[in-house]
Amino acid sequence: MEALVYTFLLVSTLGIIFFAIFFREPPKVPPTPTKRIK
């Protein structure tokens, strides 16, 4: 049962970090082709 809690905490932390990094970047990216998006 603890493994489930630890997995949930890890996934939620990674998701929050990715969310913050993704939305912290302002749309001031130089005009490059949009094919860089994975």
Swiss-Prot record:
Keyword terms of this UniProt record: Chloroplast, Membrane, Photosynthesis, Photosystem II, Plastid, Thylakoid, Transmembrane, Transmembrane helix
Bilayer-crossing regions: 3-23
Subcellular location: Plastid, Chloroplast thylakoid membrane
Biological processes annotated in GO: photosynthesis
Gene Ontology terms: cellular component: chloroplast thylakoid membrane; photosystem II reaction center
Membrane topology: Single-pass membrane protein
SUPFAM superfamilies: Photosystem II reaction center protein T, PsbT
Signal peptide boundaries: none
Assigned protein family: Belongs to the PsbT family.
Biological function: Found at the monomer-monomer interface of the photosystem II (PS II) dimer, plays a role in assembly and dimerization of PSII. PSII is a light-driven water plastoquinone oxidoreductase, using light energy to abstract electrons from H(2)O, generating a proton gradient subsequently used for ATP formation.
Subunit note: PSII is composed of 1 copy each of membrane proteins PsbA, PsbB, PsbC, PsbD, PsbE, PsbF, PsbH, PsbI, PsbJ, PsbK, PsbL, PsbM, PsbT, PsbY, PsbZ, Psb30/Ycf12, at least 3 peripheral proteins of the oxygen-evolving complex and a large number of cofactors. It forms dimeric complexes.
Designated name of the protein: Photosystem II reaction center protein T
Originating organism: Triticum aestivum
Organism lineage: Eukaryota, Viridiplantae, Streptophyta, Embryophyta, Tracheophyta
Gene transcribed to yield this protein: psbT
